[in-house]
């Protein structure tokens, strides 16, 4: 460890198989060469069901130190996380405490009281939990007790300019007037990349047959949660319009989605609950088109991952997806215009390259770990300098 190296503690409540868990590891990787990096995993059976409590802090071979605190759930953790969190902070005396999402905002005042000299940083990804469910008692309570204290953080980082603007509208000057930076999100270019040789039409057909998709002449892919903002209904309508193409969706197959599939008799829709990253790469590479019709996204990684793997994407011209992908791939003006997505599919299956390769390379460079690390450490260096004044 370098002399005078500042130490930083990242706080995350989800495992490495989730997007937040992977992002936490990406952040640790980004800073571990310049900072003494630690991570506190706030563990619950929901996200760490296959793990046992560790007796000691663990030095990870990836260059950081892991700590953990257990609770039965994030709800009970609202109370039970506090005391052991304070104890860890007193022992570590970190220079910076970095929270991975606003739902952990209830711990910001705890950190400020336990380590008044430490700078707190909050990563803001979107404002969907805050704004999309105004009549939900669950989300009202989540906002009031968990998220609202987020504004007490010393500084903020955002995944997109769009998110930064939306956060300013919702949280107001308590957030917008504090130090902040857009750091984006990275993709693992060692994993999400083109194969050494192009995937042939026969290889794609063989891939489909192996996974039970027989007698289809193409495959579309969608990776998403079942939330109204994801606009999965339009993806299914696209499937109805092109019955000779297989439409794969990765994500939970809810009762609502099952009802749509059954009602429309969508025999060409195939659901997979989840993949590990390497399986997902194979689906990206063997798909003909990634379809991402979301009304709202804070960033939108899946279409970027798909393009990195050599497969084109078509997306809705909305929110942060527009910010990231305009000029790179086709964007549909009206997010629920299923025929417009189907028309792009027809172009792809006819052999047209719908991607601007130069713009795509620029995007992938911006989303590389190297670029991400530069933005993250650049912002944290500023915080360190301000702290030492």
Residue ranges and their predicted role:
Residues 295:
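Aromatic "clamp/platform" in nucleotide-sugar-dependent glycosyltransferases that forms part
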Residues 330-339, 347-352:
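Conserved acidic donor-binding segment of nucleotide-sugar-dependent glycosyltransferases
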Residues 13-18, 30-76, 163, 178-179:
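N-terminal strand-loop element at the rim of the active site
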Residues 258-281:
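Nucleotide-activated donor-binding/catalytic signature segment of Leloir-type glycosyltransferases, i.e.
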Residues 138-156:
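Membrane-proximal helix-turn-helix segments that form the acceptor-binding/catalytic region
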Residues 312-315:
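Short hydrophobic beta-strand element within catalytic cores of glycosyltransferases
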Residues 9, 212-230, 239:
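Conserved donor-binding/catalytic core segment of Leloir-type glycosyltransferases
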Residues 282-287:
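Short alpha-helical donor nucleotide-sugar binding micro-motif in glycosyltransferases
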